[in-house]
Amino acid sequence: MFRQAKWDEPLIFELSRPGRVGYTLPKPIEDIKVDIPEKLRRKSKLELPELSEPEIVKHYTRLSEMNYGVDSGIYPLGSCTMKYNPKINEEIATHPKVAYIHPYQDERTVQGALAIMWELEQWLKEITGMDRFTLQPAAGANGEFTGVMIIRAYHLDNGEPQRNEMLVPDSAHGTNPASAAMAGFKVIEIPSNENGTIDLEALENAVSERTAGLMLTNPNTLGIFEDEIVEIAKIIHKAGGLLYYDGANLNGILGKIRPGDMGFDIVHLNLHKTFSTPHGGGGPGAGPVGVKEFLKDYLPVPLVSYDEKSGRYYLDYNVPKSIGKVKELYGNFAVLVRALTYLKIMGRDGLREVSEIAVLNANYLTQKLKGTRGYSLPGKELRKHEVVFSAEPMKKETGVKALDVAKRLLDFGMHAPTIYFPLIVHEALMIEPTETVSKEELDAYVEALKRISEEAYTNPEIVKSAPHNTAVKRVDDVLAAKKPIVTWRMYKELKEKGEVDY
């Protein structure tokens, strides 16, 4: 049984002691006098923690022992593709010639960086069947917003301002309707049928002269391939709308079929999912957006282009109908470097194998867990890269909810799946093992879920009160949202006022 380390670890500011140092700045080779305007000078002392290097290393090592990541074990968050991040990615991304260049440098001095961005775009075009990409968006949701803004600009440019409705399936990621709403669209929800795919009759009834487009994930969030995608594309295009591809689940079809060949006009990708760049910590991520030829003039500026005559790469601002910038500078460059490293190492055959093993792992887990008491399997049985089980039978029969199952999994030293999503599945357990998980890990995960099922029906309280073996027990799920304390200064002020007691 798993037992997590537990340290009573203070904040790094609380460990600080005046005069302790972990780094000594080199002496300047000459006196540097900088005339800083008075209004820009600090009025108070810069409050930074003072610790020695050993103290810092021990502090963060202890914190890491109370954490869990993709390097710790299976991390099957559905629709997140938490695959292993190869360490060669980090080696390349932290190379001085990558890490120490500056975005304000003359483009003649960063030809290598521009070449990396240009080459990554060629890979993404080939993988998706798109004709042009922007690498600027910082994450999936930022990419979505970019895509729907392009849709909006396209319709306005064509004299169709009445196209203000964005169609979104009921199984969609929550960011889809949010991005559409931010771009000024009215969101129309399209229901799923009994197979877990889009209801074509409902889709046909929903389209009109007001339809701007349809945002679709394929495979969808149930892990089911939308096998009527060609007909879906025809319906949308006949109505004058555009088809938008949410690339969150590209890992399930990588190297097998391309969104552009299915009829999609715009795609966004999540490099931090499909192409092994790190998740978490608030970023950095990357959400490149690709478009078909007829939409390329709406992409954000600048693009990276190549001049064959001079043999140079350059930042191309000649994008006549551009929606403008969606992020400062040129995107999260180090993330782009990691993704290209992964692509070049894997190659075409390797990428195809990625999706094959991801699909195999998801279906292996599905078949091993299927039929276990308390878990039901909605929709089609054959899945792509992920599967959604429902713990609704368990809840009705024992009172043990999906949340309880997720918390109990932590006691086995395993990360919980995504829960309560998609919303169309009650008590959802959304499991995406990815291709980097071994058969032994899959077997252990299924056995843990079966063990939890047994406990739910024989000793439900042990599940309802879980986790028992982690450093932190059940947290207050809403406290951080209601009372965010995101800086040391905020925490110190609240503590001095007696408003926090920890």
From Swiss-Prot:
EC number(s) from the headed UniProt entry: 1.4.4.2
GO cellular component terms, semicolon-separated: cytosol; glycine cleavage complex
GO MF, one annotated term: pyridoxal phosphate binding
Reaction(s) the record says it catalyses: N(6)-[(R)-lipoyl]-L-lysyl-[glycine-cleavage complex H protein] + glycine + H(+) = N(6)-[(R)-S(8)-aminomethyldihydrolipoyl]-L-lysyl-[glycine-cleavage complex H protein] + CO2
Annotated positions of the N6-(pyridoxal phosphate)lysine modification: 273
SUPFAM superfamilies: PLP-dependent transferases
Cross-referenced InterPro entries: GcvPB, GDC-P_C, GDC-P_N, GDC_P, PyrdxlP-dep_Trfase, PyrdxlP-dep_Trfase_major, PyrdxlP-dep_Trfase_small
Keywords (A to Z) from UniProt: Oxidoreductase, Pyridoxal phosphate
Alphabetical list of CDD domains matching this protein: GDC-P (cd00613)
Cofactor(s) demanded: pyridoxal 5'-phosphate
GO biological process terms, semicolon-separated: glycine decarboxylation via glycine cleavage system
Family: Belongs to the GcvP family. C-terminal subunit subfamily.
Subunit-level organization: The glycine cleavage system is composed of four proteins: P, T, L and H. In this organism, the P 'protein' is a heterodimer of two subunits.
Function: The glycine cleavage system catalyzes the degradation of glycine. The P protein binds the alpha-amino group of glycine through its pyridoxal phosphate cofactor; CO(2) is released and the remaining methylamine moiety is then transferred to the lipoamide cofactor of the H protein.
PANTHER family tied to this protein: GLYCINE DEHYDROGENASE (DECARBOXYLATING), MITOCHONDRIAL, GLYCINE DEHYDROGENASE, DECARBOXYLATING
NCBIfam families: PRK04366.1 (NF003346)
Protein's recorded name: Probable glycine dehydrogenase (decarboxylating) subunit 2
